């Protein structure tokens, strides 16, 4: 799972496609643009990407790796845009605290199920929203942390 502002860099997208083809399930919550196309058979059918633009300018940099059933959690500064990956020093740091890990997982999970502002990012440029019961991730996160 990942949350980032933009997924642009060709090498990053290629690596995500390679992981998908190898059977890795990938969930991505983004705020802005994305050159990744999810849901293509035999290329990105293991990738789900949800884009959310809502009231708050929230765009977490969270990475969660399943790691064979022993999840590893990271937070970082990387925005996954070429200017940031090439011209800046970006960092990731592991998160070991279980309460913090639960918060990070909640942030990703809420984003993936946002039916009010979460649009399916599939490269078609459509406005298809995530299906399900009404759920607004930013509002629910606000309530959880209030």
Please provide the spans of the model-predicted regions.
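C-terminal catalytic subdomain
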Residues: 19
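HKD-type phospholipase D/PLD-like phosphodiesterase module
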Residues: 29-65
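Flexible, glycine-rich loop/tail regions that form catalytic "lids" or insertion modules at the edges
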Residues: 5, 16, 33-37, 45, ...
